[in-house]
Amino acid sequence: RICPRILMECSSDSDCLAECICLENGFCG
């Protein structure tokens, strides 16, 4: 999957860019 390496806080996958998912630590990855 394509995920830009940008540190973004998230509460769900929809908060993240491209194909990033919301990880357990509260950030996209």
Swiss-Prot record:
**Subcellular localization(s) per the UniProt record:** Secreted
What Gene Ontology terms describe what this protein does at the molecular function level? serine-type endopeptidase inhibitor activity
Positions of disulphide bridges: 3-20, 10-22, 16-28
Residue ranges annotated as coiled coil are: none
Keywords, alphabetical: Disulfide bond, Knottin, Protease inhibitor, Secreted, Serine protease inhibitor
Q: Which PROSITE patterns match?
A: SQUASH_INHIBITOR
Q: Name one GO cellular component term.
A: extracellular region
Write down the position(s) of the site called Reactive bond: 5-6
Q: Which domain of life is it from?
A: Eukaryota
Q: What free text does the record give on domains?
A: The presence of a 'disulfide through disulfide knot' structurally defines this protein as a knottin.
User: Under which name does UniProt file this protein?
Assistant: Trypsin inhibitor 3
Give the organism the record lists: Luffa aegyptiaca (Sponge gourd)
